[in-house]
Amino acid sequence: MAGSTIPRRALGRILHQLRIQAGKTQLAAGLIIDVSPQVIGRMEDGIPVKVSGVQVKELLRCYGAEPETAEQALALFEEVKAAKGDPRGGWWRAYKDVTSSHFDHYMNLEEACTRLTTFQMTLLPGLLQTPAYRRSMILVKEPGRSALDVEREIELGIRRRVRLLEDHEFEMNVFLSEAVLRHRVGGPAVMAEQLGHLADIGQSPNVSIRVVPREADGYIGLVVGQFTLFEFPVLRHSGLREPPVVFVEVFTGALFFEDSEMIQTYRTAVADIAEVALDEGDTRQMVLDVAKEYSA
């Protein structure tokens, strides 16, 4: 389910374009509907704000929106309102005390997308981690974390996996460096369990897992580094589709890219990585073989 994130972003994009075409500043736009320029800016950025349908209509009128564009914008506004009533929306915010500052934005995208493609060189993506694997990584990064905080973060990971297992319209394509399988996280028993889980979940119809073997010659993934590409569905009422977003995480923060040329660069990288990755069957066999090594 797209929730309110994607229609909000699409509405903001339309309002921004119309305001620029009308030659109005955010201050001028705010005066039209009696809000601050900051509210206009947040609305255009797809951030939740308190505005009414009447105010949106007035902006569209003053911007000189064509009837078709105005109809699209109002349909998006109605989608945002409808999604706000979904009790499942933003469930992860209950864990904000144990997550990073960029996690809310990441989860908005994860919950809204229908296809997630990720390339990982060091660790398994969160959606595929077992509790023991996740617990080990939390304590490596933050050895002083309280037991309660650690368990809450693990609980969050378990809840995130529900969509992967139950929503078959959600597609996850995972490319892993072989090194991910061989980095010993938590010891042999933890890794054996983790790789067994990886082999099992890779058989789900909506999950594709492919490993780039260490024998692969130099390939673009070594230069590009780790990333996640989010792709979104067509919105039900407006018929619009939001452009993809690329997420890149670093040790001290994260970057979100929306520029179309940047997105195309990452799409090309996905295609190049796919050229050197094992197919799903050979990947599963490798995962099981490495799991046996840990169990020996």
Regions picked out by a protein language model, each given a short descriptive name:
Residues 165-169, 175, 181-296:
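C-terminal regulatory/effector modules of DNA-binding transcriptional regulators
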Residues 2-13, 17, 21, 27-31, ...:
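Interdomain hinge/linker segments and adjacent boundary elements that couple functional modules
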Residues 30, 48, 219-222:
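Short glycine-biased active-site loop of nucleotidyltransferases that positions the nucleotide triphosphate
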